[in-house]
Amino acid sequence: MAMTGLNTAGSDRDYDTQSLNRELQDKGFLLTTTEDLINWARTGSLHWMTFGLACCAVEMMHTSMPRYDVERFGVAPRASPRQSDVMIVAGTLTNKMAPALRKVYDQMPEPRYVISMGSCANGGGYYHYSYSVVRGCDRIVPVDIYVPGCPPTAEALLYGILQLQRKIRRTGTITR
């Protein structure tokens, strides 16, 4: 039974939408928004680019191998930043390499995401107190997901990629 009245306009609209949705589903149609459709497509077709600077890059390669096969989740590697949605920064970022990282990030199309992989990329790691090390790649580019570890396992990176997909589904791409 539907509620009616001055203060229940939202409830009436929700009830009408739900009944319309059920009726269309019975006939084989799907009722959704454009934003939900875009988010669904974006999470299923992420293209990542490696920015491997040290030993974490080896674990990044393991993620693409047959044991973990990250491509089954709709994530595929790309060689060019212009074709990439996600940049995975893995390893120690030095002051000399920081401008190159920013340049590659700026070449990526919007919306773009960054995964910081390993202790060195997250906060400088073992070389934190060195004069030539940037203490976290988040000082150069905005980071969406941090994957801890030295080096993090392929499972940890895979979990980080899945968390990024959840974040995209939750926050959306139009409002980012």
Curated annotation (Swiss-Prot):
Binding partners and assembly: NDH-1 is composed of 14 different subunits. Subunits NuoB, C, D, E, F, and G constitute the peripheral sector of the complex.
PANTHER family associated with the record:
NADH DEHYDROGENASE, NADH DEHYDROGENASE [UBIQUINONE] IRON-SULFUR PROTEIN 7, MITOCHONDRIAL
Reaction(s) the record says it catalyses = a quinone + NADH + 5 H(+)(in) = a quinol + NAD(+) + 4 H(+)(out)
Which organism is this entry from?
Answer: Cereibacter sphaeroides (strain ATCC 17023 / DSM 158 / JCM 6121 / CCUG 31486 / LMG 2827 / NBRC 12203 / NCIMB 8253 / ATH 2.4.1.) (Rhodobacter sphaeroides)
Q: Sorted alphabetically, which keywords does the UniProt record give?
A: 4Fe-4S, Cell inner membrane, Cell membrane, Iron, Iron-sulfur, Membrane, Metal-binding, NAD, Quinone, Translocase, Transport, Ubiquinone
Bilayer topology term: Peripheral membrane protein
Similarity annotation: Belongs to the complex I 20 kDa subunit family.
Q: What is its EC number?
A: 7.1.1.-
Kindly list the biological process annotations in GO that this record carries. aerobic respiration; electron transport coupled proton transport
What does it do? Answer: NDH-1 shuttles electrons from NADH, via FMN and iron-sulfur (Fe-S) centers, to quinones in the respiratory chain. Couples the redox reaction to proton translocation (for every two electrons transferred, four hydrogen ions are translocated across the cytoplasmic membrane), and thus conserves the redox energy in a proton gradient.
Q: Where in the cell is it found?
A: Cell inner membrane
Cofactors:
[4Fe-4S] cluster
Q: Which GO terms describe its cellular component?
A: plasma membrane; respiratory chain complex I
Residues bound to [4Fe-4S] cluster: C55, C56, C120, C150
According to its UniProt record, where is this protein mainly located?
Answer: membrane
Name the Gene Ontology molecular function terms of this record: 4 iron, 4 sulfur cluster binding; iron ion binding; NADH dehydrogenase (ubiquinone) activity; NADH:ubiquinone reductase (non-electrogenic) activity; quinone binding
**Cited PROSITE patterns:** COMPLEX1_20K
| Enzyme class (EC, first level) | translocase
Q: Does the keyword Transmembrane helix apply?
A: no
According to the record, cofactor stoichiometry and binding are noted as: Binds 1 [4Fe-4S] cluster.
- What HAMAP family would the database entry show? NDH1_NuoB (MF_01356)
Please indicate which superkingdom the organism of origin belongs to. Answer: Bacteria
Give the matching InterPro entries.
NADH_UbQ_OxRdtase-like_20kDa, NADH_UQ_OxRdtase_20Kd_su
Q: What name appears for this protein in its UniProt entry?
A: NADH-quinone oxidoreductase subunit B 1
